[in-house]
Design a protein with these regions (language model features):
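Helicase motor core with emphasis on the C-terminal RecA-like subdomain
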Residues: 19-20, 24-33, 37, 41, ...
Length: 322
């Protein structure tokens, strides 16, 4: 490495050596914390991109290993990684898993006491937090923005990034507050992740998040572990009960209206199948409670509208009925 005045001149060989060392570090973290020998799909490319300070958009299917793409570099880099997600249940689940691995992860959500929130934010300012999970609504609070100014932020992760786009199927105005974080921390790159995006949504996500330049990584959405079956039947309810009784593990039944979720759950219960229902019209606490019941196998079937689905991580789901 040659110093020329204020400039540092690095030869290509040295740059390659540094890149290889960094790649080895990521791989070591993956092995140490998750036990996997190597990355899969586009995980490595996304991790390298965000670690180089580039705004990055990753399109990955459910089960594609999205969480690895921000958790590994967050552990490797200095500072706190801010993770924006709308799903409290997912926050709690990921924080619990990370803390079990010895990672300094915390979550801030609406039902927490103010003193507890302040303690976590102060800890983040002092460098005691590696990953900080927050809801998009939290971003625009004065309390959060004041503390954020004093944090060393490694990068910002935006999960379910399609929620920021008005072209997306699940637009959430609260996601627009992410642009305020970028004003406070312009040096922190953004990693946006989604499993659902049309070409228009892809462009809109990057524009709304203020990407310095377009930078998209795509993973194949082909799912070889899924089988798609269409059945014609004169009695859909009877056929559904037959399928649910025949298949072990958990199940999801999607219906087109909120009223139908309740009716179908009651029908299944009468047929001797444990079920609950979920839709956007329920209170947040009720939704969380029912999702937890299903996650913890207290009920077999979740009957829902398309409000249910983001961030679901349940390995024993064996059938999804529409």
């Amino acid at each position: 490495m040659l110093h020329a005045g204020k400039y540092i001149v690095t030869d290509e060989k040295e740059e390659n050596g540094l890149a290889n060392t960094q790649q080895d570090r990521f791989k070591d973290i993956l092995k140490e914390y998750w036990g996997y020998p190597d990355f899969r799909g586009i995980q490595r490319e996304i991790i390298e991109s965000i670690s180089q300070g580039k705004d990055t958009l990753g399109l990955m299917p459910t089960g594609g290993g999205k969480s690895i793409t921000f958790q590994v570099p967050a552990i490797a880099m200095e500072g706190v990684c801010i993770v924006v997600t709308p799903l409290i249940a997912l926050m709690k689940d990921q924080v619990e898993h990370l803390r079990h691995k010895g990672v300094k992860a915390y979550a801030i959500y609406s039902s927490m006491q103010r003193a507890e929130i302040l303690k976590i934010l102060d800890n983040a300012v002092l460098g005691g937090v590696t990953l900080l999970y927050v809801s998009p609504e939290r971003l625009s609070t004065e309390q959060f923005l004041i503390k954020l100014k004093h944090m060393k932020v490694s990068f910002i992760t935006v999960d379910e990034a399609h929620c920021i786009s008005q072209w997306g199927y699940d637009f959430r105005p609260s996601y627009l507050a992410i642009s305020e974080i970028r004003k406070v921390k312009p040096e922190a790159p953004v990693l946006a992740l989604t499993a659902t995006a049309t070409p228009a949504t892809i462009d809109d996500i990057q524009d709304k998040l203020g990407f310095k330049q377009k930078n998209v990584f795509r993973m194949s959405f082909e799912r070889k572990n899924l089988a798609y079956i269409v059945r014609e039947t004169s009695d859909k309810k009877e056929q559904m009960v037959h399928i649910l009784e025949s298949v072990e593990g958990s199940a999801i039944v999607y219906v087109y209206s909120r009223q139908k979720t309740k009716e179908m759950a009651e029908y299944l219960q009468q047929a001797g199948i444990s079920a609950t229902f979920y839709h956007a019209g329920l209170e947040h606490s009720t939704r969380d409670e029912r999702q937890t019941m299903w996650q913890e196998d207290k009920v077999k079937v979740m009957v829902a509208t398309n409000a249910f689905g983001m961030g679901i991580d349940k390995p024993d789901v064996r059938v999804v009925i529409h």
